[in-house]
Amino acid sequence: VSSPQAKIALFRSLFRGRDDVYPRRFESRKTGRSGYAPACANEWIRGVCEKPRIKCAECPNRRFLPVTDDVIRWHLSGSDAEGQPFVAGVYPLLQDETCWLLAVDFDKSSWREDVQAFADTARRVGLPVLVERSRSGNGAHVWFFFEEPVPAAMARRMGCHLITETMSARHELSM
């Protein structure tokens, strides 16, 4: 059994992206709409944050929050220090246009078969994968982790090549 700190260290060693900002999941109580937005230290502070009148991307007062061990701890436990639901994401594209990982998303009705075929293709060419069930339960992400940052364009080409190879064996797979 690993200590909480060891679990955080393992998670951070795999799911590496930008350290200066991370996306946080939100869910609107009014509309039920959900998504991810950059975590901001000024969010909803009266007189500073002008949401919803102004979008975060256009806000002169935005102050992104960095990825910390606490952020990872909250993500892994599912709630923040105040006990509120907490889910963090990762911005994989680094500022120099490299990345530490590639995630491929499958969410069509045949996602189970598609993921299996895609993972088989990757393993056949010697690439280890991690398969993660989507939050909704109606899809999955297939993750590839690199030992060092690689050009994002190269990672994308690798993913496209694997999809093309998979499609030659499983014609039902669509982009």
Which positions does each model-derived feature cover?
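Signature for HUH/AEP ssDNA processing cores
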Residues: 4-138, 145-161
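Low-complexity, flexible helical/coil segments
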Residues: 139-141, 168
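Flexible helix-coil linker/hinge segments at domain or subdomain boundaries
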Residues: 163-175
